[in-house]
Swiss-Prot record:
Low complexity bias: start-end ranges: 441-460
Annotated GO CC locations: cytoplasm
Gene from which the chain derives: tig
Domains: entry comment: Consists of 3 domains; the N-terminus binds the ribosome, the middle domain has PPIase activity, while the C-terminus has intrinsic chaperone activity on its own.
Protein name listed in UniProt: Trigger factor
């Protein structure tokens, strides 16, 4: 067999494959034997008739075509294996010589990645710190999360920080527009209410209502699509106004969080914030390293691989919508897009994810990174012992698909660790005290889980809150950003 390989754009290769005369003669003989078993020639048992009689009965062309079919399949697979090519689409085949067989194949293949110069990438580690003001902010958030909501002694208009219970209705002409919000709870200054609604609420005492119009720009992406380009008539009714009674920040407050003293609480908050900042800094350094790696990498994505990724993304969304009781068709109608338009929107993201994956896999191969069976078993055992139900955990990870998922996670972790080690010259993504915290400092003894809230943005808790449906809430609240803030600023 003779093979000529030509690399074309978009990770496509052209293979010119020519069979040796001896190979083709052997393939003809095998084809003749297969066909002769199926042909009835008077005076001969199946498979016993002379070749000339069989050719006369079925035509030499059939035997040649059968030999070509078998030989093309085998030689094509051998050519791919010999040149380490992995097809990602069906090949286009052209036979340009019948005997001995010679044919041309064009096929999109798994792309090769060039990482020339990647070992010279450098990224500076981060040093992070926590200020007293940041600790104060978290303590204040914890304080507000334990607020007791009380009705003011005298009825009054609401102000920043007050909790309001309201009805919000919207009309398009005379007809109600979507489901109204009933007995919905908001905290003024902490909810992304439309500026007009926020201002109206602030002007009303309990039991009072206001009516007004809001016009939404066609291009305003901060509101839900069904509102864009419309002018709606709103009616807002305030039912209750409540003010927050906040606990004093002292040792008793700390004890309500499972910490002995206020000083210990501040130490715990500081350490948790430091860990959070260190994790964020590590993620930033890692992402910067990945972006630098992508910059030095050269890779051409085959269109078939991109289409496969887009199709997978569409099916993933379809399944997610199905689990929520919806459908892709309903989603597209809501977005006002066709399936092809939606796929076109997905394509740049799909290309970026594919390129990132391929480059990181090429880095792993260049660095000899792999997950051994011993490493996988050790990780399963570590997780099992930490789970509290080791036997059940081990049984769960004996399932091949689950085991494979964990192996992928370990692989990604090893790739990240090696990349960070390389770009920081072994110093790590963060340095100083944050590095020690990130390495896994244990929580202080006697600290209850409640104190973990210190590193999260707490929400104001009130047992009387009546949540609104997502579709109804879109009548009053921005989807992204803060339309209210922008409008008030202007």
């Amino acid at each position: 067999m003779k093979i000529t390989v030509e690399h074309l754009p978009q990770s496509t290769v052209r293979l010119d494959i020519a069979a040796d005369p001896e190979e083709f003669d052997a393939a003809l003989e095998r084809a003749f034997r297969r066909i002769s078993q199926q042909v009835q020639v008077p005076g001969f048992r199946p498979g016993r008739a002379p070749r000339a009689l069989v050719e006369r009965r079925v035509g030499r062309e059939l035997i040649v075509a059968e030999a070509q079919r078998e030989l093309m399949d085998r030689l094509y697979r051998e050519a791919l294996q010999q040149h380490r090519l992995t097809p990602v689409a069906e090949p286009e085949v052209e036979i340009y010589q019948d005997e001995p067989l010679a044919f041309r194949v064009e096929v999109q293949v798994y792309p090769q990645v060039d990482l020339d110069g990647y070992r010279d990438i450098r990224v500076e580690p981060r040093e992070v710190e926590v200020t007293e003001e940041e600790i104060d902010q978290v303590i204040e958030g914890l304080r507000r999360s334990r607020a007791v909501w009380k009705t003011p002694d005298e009825p009054r208009q609401p102000r920043d920080g007050d909790q309001v219970i309201v009805d919000i209705e919207a009309y398009e002409g005379e007809q109600p527009f979507q489901e109204p919000l009933r007995q919905a709870t908001f905290v003024l200054g902490e909810s992304n209410l439309f500026a007009e609604i926020d201002q109206a609420i602030r002007s009303l005492r309990p039991g009072e209502s206001a009516e007004f119009d809001i016009s939404f720009a066609e291009e305003d992406e901060r509101v839900s699509p069904e509102l864009r380009g419309k002018t709606l008539h709103y009616r807002v009714t305030v039912h209750e106004v409540k003010e927050a009674e906040l606990p004093e920040v002292n040792d008793e407050f700390a004890q309500s969080l499972g910490v002995a003293t206020l000083s210990e609480l501040r130490d715990r908050v500081r350490r948790d914030l430091l860990r959070e900042k260190a994790q964020a800094a590590r993620a930033e350094v890692l992402e910067q390293a990945v972006q630098r790696l992508l910059e030095v990498a050269t890779v051409e994505l085959p269109p078939a691989l991109i289409e496969r990724q887009v199709a997978a993304d569409v099916e993933r969304l379809r399944e997610q919508l199905r689990q929520r009781g919806s459908s892709l068709e309903e989603y597209l109608r809501f977005q006002g897009k066709t399936l092809e338009e939606f796929k076109e929107e997905l394509r740049p993201q799909a290309e970026a994810r594919l390129r990132r994956y391929l480059v990181l896999e090429a880095f792993a191969e260049a660095e000899g990174i792999a997950v051994s069976e011993e490493e996988l078993v050790a990780e399963i055992e570590r997780l099992a012992l930490a789970s509290g139900s080791p036997e059940q955990f081990r049984a769960f990870y004996s399932v091949p698909s689950v085991r494979s998922y964990l192996a992928d996670e370990l692989h990604e972790r090893k790739v990240s660790e090696r990349l960070l080690e390389l770009v920081t010259e072994g110093r790590g993504a963060v340095i100083g005290e944050a590095a020690r915290v990130l390495a896994g400092a244990e929580p202080a003894e006697g600290t209850e889980p409640a104190a973990e809230e210190a590193v999260t943005a707490p929400e104001v808790v009130d047992g009387e809150t009546t949540p609104a449906s997502e579709s109804a809430e879109s009548l009053a609240v921005t989807e992204t950003g803060s339309r209210a803030d922008d409008d008030q600023a202007s």
